[in-house]
UniProtKB/Swiss-Prot annotation:
Keywords: Cell inner membrane, Cell membrane, Ion transport, Manganese, Membrane, Transmembrane, Transmembrane helix, Transport. This is Probable manganese efflux pump MntP. It is a multi-pass membrane protein. It comes from Escherichia coli (strain K12). GO terms for molecular function: manganese ion transmembrane transporter activity. It is found in: Cell inner membrane. GO terms for cellular component: plasma membrane. Residues 24-65, 129-142, 188 are periplasmic. Disruption phenotype: Deletion causes manganese sensitivity and leads to increased intracellular manganese levels. Its main location: membrane. Signal peptide: none annotated. GO terms for biological process: intracellular manganese ion homeostasis; manganese ion export across plasma membrane. Residues 1-2, 87-105, 164-167 are cytoplasmic.
Length: 188
């Protein structure tokens, strides 16, 4: 996977966390930069670890399905991208109803894990491709740190407008990467 695909994947994977951070930022009266950075660090750390875990799980099965690697990555990315798009079109969830208060550490960790399950599944798919998983996981984590911090800071201003659109954009990016993987396999 080339650098462009890695960066697109990283920012595509960060869109769930970005959308969640916008929601979190929108529930706080005036989120401070330190609160936003704390959220970004938690989301980024979790989002760095989950593709590594998924990659490890995928490597255990790689020798059995190596000839199907491009199809596995394609189907996973299409599925995850489609799920993100569907979530983006759904109405506001209970998370938007939280009181305006500082979010606790464990609530942020739980939210980060929930938004990073896609990254774990992508990690499984990446096990079947020739990628530097450490660099890819770090790119995903850094993109998530940036996008989550940014999402918290702008959440109170645009939470109701762009929150779900960010998930739609992330889903489209994942689908695009899936199509690119399949295209590259067949057209070299």
């Amino acid at each position: 996977m080339n650098i462009t695909a890695t960066v697109l994947l990283a920012f595509g994977m960060s869109m769930d966390a970005f959308a969640a951070s916008i929601g979190k930022g929108a529930t706080l009266h005036k989120p401070k930069f330190s609160e936003a950075l704390r959220t970004g660090l938690i989301f980024g750390a979790v989002e760095t670890l989950t593709p590594l875990i998924g990659w490890g799980m995928g490597m255990l099965a790689s020798r059995f399905v190596l000839e199907w690697n491009h199809w596995i990555a394609f189907v996973l990315l299409i599925f995850l991208g489609g799920r993100m798009i569907i979530e983006g079109f759904r109405g506001a969830d209970d998370e938007d109803e939280e009181p305006r208060r500082r979010h606790g550490f464990w609530l942020l960790v739980t939210t980060a894990i929930a938004t990073s399950l896609d990254a774990m599944a992508v990690g499984v798919g990446l096990a079947f491709l020739q990628v530097n998983i450490i660099a890819t996981a770090l790119a995903i984590g850094c993109a998530t740190l940036i996008m989550s911090t940014l999402g918290m800071m702008v959440g109170r201003f645009i939470g109701s407008i762009i929150g779900k659109k960010a998930e739609i954009l992330g889903g489209l990016v994942l689908i695009g990467i899936g199509v690119q993987i399949l295209w590259t396999h067949f057209h070299g």
